[in-house]
Structures are given as structure tokens and as C-alpha cells.
Amino acid sequence: MSLNDDQLQALAYLNRGCNVFITGSAGTGKTHLIRFFIHDQHTYGKQIGITATTGAAALHIGGKTLHSFMAIGLAKKSAEALAMQTMTKNKRTAKKLRALDTLVIDEVSLMDAELFDKLSAYLQIIRDDVRPFGGVQLVLCGDFAQLPPVSGSYCFTSKVWKQANIKLAKLTTPMRQQDDTVFFSLLERARWGSLTEEDMETLRSRVQATESFPDYIVPTRLYSVNADVDAINSQHLQDILDKGETMQQYEPKYEGGAEAQKERTRAWATSLGVPARLALCRGAQVVVTYNINQEDLVNGTRAVVEDLSPTSVIIKLKNGVRKVISPIVVSCDDDKSLRVTYLPLKLAWAVTIHRSQGLTLDAVQMDLGNRIFATGQAYTALSRAKTLESVSIISLSPNAFKADPLVLKFYGVSQ
């Protein structure tokens, strides 16, 4: 595994034991550097926690989701309550965290400031060490110019970020778009919300463009809102059903005695993204929506339905491995009376831009119109592609590309 000059500079910080935030444009080799560092640390017998804020990102680096590794559930309780719970009821995790040398957090840009501070306090208590994150070396990776946290403020605004003396390591060499440097330069301007009129003309040339896609490649469609994604997926499913395949429907089971309790459970499950009804058939493109295991069935795993029964589904992963998916039982972290049983799959001919973060797509179609609602969203979608020719744009708005002023200030970018 070779590294470029930017990556070697970042590695020098890491090897000195510094807390480091590895950042850069999409496709500049951030995850590659993380993998290199992890391999390096293992050879020296270091205890390293390999985590990411999303299941899909965790899969890329061979780790676990941050919440799973830390055993903090939904992290709704205080740091003190979470630490006490771990030390009394999950002593194995407490022992693991006390022995930890380094904590890797990929896609840290999706974490809000409140959780960042809470995790630091949590480790301080468990490790009995008042230093930020209990003295554990932090290796953070992400890009604040991409998608912001779902709620709350950026973690770089937290108290602990300043206290931890985190070094900034910027990667600038394109890896994903290395064969299309013109496209990479356009993406850099899109990252900061400073596209030129020439850039917009270039993007307009890709509106409804599909000539570069071979017939057997169906571009993955990216949308900013779930409603658009649902419409595309429903149409593709119907196309398969029209050819004679049989549909199987799966409905969640909401536990609770009284009807009012079931309604509470239903509302809670909906907030988790559990659909009221899931329709599948053989040939359906799906995505796993829950971290079933830490190896190959995590939130974000893509697959195709090979067979199905009233109680389970057989899916085929991208690597050809077949897996049986059965309903799972999920309970609320703060109220164990809230329990739902459901099949953790979702149709995936189209996906939201949020779910696409971290992917590299050879053929991608996206909506960059007026439905873009978050800073960094359009840039995240566009930067999934390797080349401009691999992009087809459904609709385009000049207002779609915007950067948060806080992010511009953090990176020292002036406009």
C-alpha cells in the first residue's frame, strides 16, 4: 500500500501519537490512509478501535459502528449514566475501552458536537483519566464540506475539539477522479459553493445525458428526499411484477398491550425508518438497513433478492455471497416496552444522497434541482462519480451548490 506526500505527512502526525483530523475532498484517499495506519498499528500490537458513524463506512475499514463499539445504544442518556451502565452491565466492553490506545472514527463529519463531547466524558469516566477522550489517541476522518450532521452543530464546534489539540491533515491529491482532473477541479469549486458559469454550462451538458452508459448498466439514482426515492423504487418493482414475478409483503409487528401503547411503538419505529409495509420480489435491488453483523451485513450493504418466503429473504451480496435475512427485534434504548419486529431491508434502485456518502459509482444519476435542501448535499452526490461522463443529471439548479459559512471558516476558505 503506497502513500502520496499528503498522506505521508498525515501519517507522521499519527505516528507521533497526535490527535489528527484527516480531511480533504471526496476521493482523495482518506479511507486508504486509515486502512494503512490500522495495518501499521496492528503490527506493533496496538489496541485500536476501528469505528465509523455509519454502517457502510464501518464496512469499508473493517470496523464497527461507533455506537456498537462503544456499547452506547442510541446515546440518549448522559455520559455518566452510559459509563455506569457499561461498567456494571458490560464489563467486557469497559475492559476493552480501558486498554484502548487509539480510536479511529471515520465519517466523523456526520457526528454532532453534543455526541462528541459526550463520548469524551464517557471515556474519561471509564478510563478514570481527565484528558480528552480519556487519553486515547483520536484518528478522525471526514469532510465537513459534505453532508452535515442530521441534527445539532458540527463536532468541530464542541468544547472537546478545542481541548484535544487536533491536528488538521489535508489530503489534496485526487484518487477517485485521477483520470479526469478537469472534473476534479470543478468538484473543488462545488465543494466551496463557488461554481463558475463555465462550470454550470459543463454540468448542463450532462442533464439527461445517458450516452456513455452501456445497455447493461443501470445508473444508481441519487435523490435528496425519500419521497423521490420511494417513487423510483416502486416503479422498478412494478416492472418486475409485470413480468410475472410474485410479490411478498412484510409488515412490522408492533408490541404492546393497549392500542395507545402500540401507537407509541409505531411512531417510534417510524422515526427509526421502519416502513409500515415492505414489498419485495425476486430480482429486487435492496439495501440492508440495520447492522445485523459486523462483517458483511451492515446498514448500507447492497444486494439483490434471490428468493423469498413469508418469513425470510435470501439475498445475494455484491461479492456473490448469499445470506438469509430474517426479521429482527429492536427495542428502545430508553423504554424497553417499545419493541418492533421487522425485516431490515429496503428497495434500492434509488438511494438518498445521505446513504450514498462514501461510495464510488461508475454510473450514477442524480437530481441536483430545487429539492436539494442541505449544504454539501449536491457536492456529495456529484463527487460519487469517477468522471463527468459517468454522470447523468436529472435536473439542475444553480442554488443547489452551497457551503456552510461555519465550514468555510473552519477550513480557512474565503469567498
Put a short name on every predicted segment.
Residues 1-415:
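Conserved ATP-binding/catalytic motifs of P-loop helicase motor domains
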